[in-house]
C-alpha cells in the first residue's frame, strides 16, 4: 500500500517537470495495478493549487471526476481528531500541516511508503519516500 502526496497529481495537472512519470504512476493506480491512499485534504489542496494556476472550473471538474475511475485509490476522510493529532506530528517532525496530515494518516493506516517529490518526508525515520521514477515509472 502506498500514500500519494498531492504533488504527484499536480505534476500531471500542471504539466510540470515530472508530469510524464507521475502520469504513468497514476495510470497504474487508476487501473488497479497499484493500491494507494490519499486524503480528502490532499485532493482539496490539488484543486486550490490548480485554481491558483488559473485552471478553469472545467479542468477542476475533470480532475475530480477522474478520481472516481481510480480502481486502486482510496480516499481517507480526515476527522478533526486527525487534524489535531497532525499538529503533534508538526511539532515532533518539523513538518508543515499538509505533510503532517499525510504522515498522521500513513501511521493510522499502517502505510510506510509515500509517493512524493517533497524531500521533507525524508526527515521522518519510519517513512520511505519514493518518486514515480524510483518505482520504475
Predicted regions span which residues?
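Acidic, PIN/NYN-like endoribonuclease modules and their adjacent C-terminal/linker elements
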Residues: 1, 108-137
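Short, well-structured N-terminal submotif of metal-dependent ribonuclease cores
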Residues: 1-38, 53-62, 136-137
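Acidic active-site catalytic centers that drive phospho-/nucleotidyl reactions
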Residues: 5, 99, 118
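Residues that scaffold the ATP/ADP-binding catalytic core of kinase and kinase-like folds
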Residues: 11-13, 49, 124
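Short, conserved alpha-helical segments within structured domains
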Residues: 38-42, 82
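Active-site neighborhoods of divalent-metal-dependent phosphate/nucleic-acid chemistry enzymes
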Residues: 74-113
